[in-house]
Design a protein with these regions (language model features):
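Flexible, low-complexity junctional segments that flank or bridge functional domains
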Residues: 1-224, 230-232, 394-452
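C-terminal "post-core" interaction segments
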Residues: 185-225, 229-452
């Protein structure tokens, strides 16, 4: 039987009648001293401090407000610089206390895969859950704990178990790679349609976008597609500056804080870089978040573009990163509102034209799981690094003869994605298989989307 000796701990601060904030601060100091004095073994001051800070931020119940250790601050810096070692996923986790989504499972969820990375190549999608990392359940892990395990030296592997549609479970041993986060890609579709892909909003993204728009202007494009799918956001100011390239007046976004003097309204300032006669389609999905939603709403609410795709992620809060010596923290210090004065946090922005690839049937889901578990696509491409159309068709027929139930179009896309990744030759856009892009092009050319 354990022997428990009860000591009475009465903080002097209770007798002093201090205000609550200062009172709790003094209690914290006294608690630290009490533990260090009476705990049977030696106690590490830094470990106590970090534990207390993490508990403080956890008590807020906001997944975007977190205490960050020195290592986590370094990782955040690597991400901001656009390069780190990992698998290539933006992830999130909501506390059960927040009540964000009753149907949401208590695991880390993929916000979006980063293009041209190991996770992207394997077909990981926005909305997939990460239920295990290296065999350990993520249910009780913090977001940072999961991220820390997934990151590592390029060339090493991490085992990740995913859950899709709440009934497809699959595990990959993923080789970590040097993850570079490109923010802008651009090209022409059919010579007169500009295609602008923004994958995230870094500090230098506006310069890259301006360069692409200047090139489009020289080519005298008639239409423009801005693709913000699987864009997790980034720097608020970058989204505002880019919105200004398309608007000559009107509100871009407003930010409201607890401190009234911090409230700001950002207006367009006549820095338009593309002709107002060019109709614009903006592609969005549930992986479009934060700054991507700001740009989408700014263009849509001001009548400059039509949104096509799926309802966005729904992150309408603004965080600031602050340092505490070598440690630091990220705190939600405001919420942003669209030009129509709507905060889309936990709601998202619906498209004006809903388009998405159809969901897989139960039979197709089972076939997809089988392909993943048996690495069939990867093995085929390893044996046929540059397969001909005939070889791909023959492979597809072989899969079907073995009981794989899936459209030829989907199987062909899986093969081509693997080939492109292995050859480091991913196309800027995919008009053959991308049904959302196909619809955007159709609507632009038919005149359903008009310049405003």
């Amino acid at each position: 039987m354990a022997l428990v000796l009860f000591l009475t701990f009465v903080p002097a601060t209770f007798a002093q009648g201090a205000g609550k904030s200062s009172q709790y601060g003094l209690i914290f100091d006294e608690m630290m001293r009490f533990i260090k004095t009476y705990y049977i073994d030696e106690v590490d001051d830094k470990a106590l401090f970090e534990g207390a800070m993490k508990g403080m931020f956890d008590a807020i119940g906001d997944p975007h407000s977190v205490f960050m250790t020195e290592q986590e601050m370094d990782s955040a810096s690597d991400s901001a610089m656009g390069q780190f070692g990992g698998v290539g996923l933006y992830i999130s986790k909501y506390s059960a206390d927040v009540g964000y989504d009753e149907d949401r499972l208590p695991y880390v969820r993929v916000v979006s895969p980063i293009e041209d990375t190991p996770a992207y190549r394997l077909g990981i999608k926005a909305g997939d859950y990460i239920v295990k990392v290296d065999g350990k359940s993520t249910e009780a892990m913090t977001l940072d704990e999961v991220a820390k395990i997934m990151r590592g030296k390029p060339g090493t592997t991490v085992s990740i178990t995913f859950l899709r549609d709440k009934n497809i479970v699959f595990t990959y041993d993923i080789e970590r790679a040097n993850i570079e986060v490109p923010s802008v890609k651009s090209d022409l579709i059919e010579k007169n349609i500009g295609y602008l892909r923004i994958t995230n909003f870094a500090a230098n993204t506006p310069d890259k976008v301006k360069e692409a728009l200047d090139n489009f202007s020289k080519k005298r494009i008639k239409y423009l597609v801005i693709d913000l799918r699987s864009n997790p956001g980034g720097v608020l100011e970058s989204a505002i500056e880019i919105a200004d390239f398309f608007l000559d007046d009107g509100v871009i976004v407003s930010v409201k804080s607890k401190i009234p003097s911090w409230n700001q309204v950002y207006n367009a300032s006549k820095k338009v870089k593309i002709s107002k006669s060019v109709p614009i389609a903006v592609l969005i999905d549930r992986g479009s978040a934060s700054a991507a939603e700001i740009l989408s709403a700014a263009l849509s609410d001001n009548g400059r573009a039509v949104l096509i795709g799926e309802t966005t992620y729904g992150k309408g809060s603004v965080q600031q990163l602050r340092s505490l010596g070598k440690d630091g923290f990220k705190l939600t210090m405001g919420k942003y509102y669209t030009p129509k004065d709507i905060n889309i946090d936990k709601v998202g922005i619906p498209p004006e034209k809903e388009v998405k690839d159809r969901d897989l049937t139960d039979e197709e889901k089972a076939s997809y799981k089988k392909l993943i578990e048996e690495y069939r696509i990867q093995k085929f491409v390893k044996d046929n690094p540059k397969p001909s159309d005939l070889q791909i068709d023959t492979f597809i027929q072989q899969l079907k003869s073995e009981g794989i139930v899936m459209e030829d179009r989907i199987l062909r896309k899986l093969v081509r994605n693997e080939v492109n990744f292995n050859n480091n030759d991913s196309p800027v856009y995919d008009l053959e298989f991308d049904v959302v892009l196909q619809e955007a092009v159709r609507m632009l050319k038919s005149g359903e989307i008009k310049a405003k």
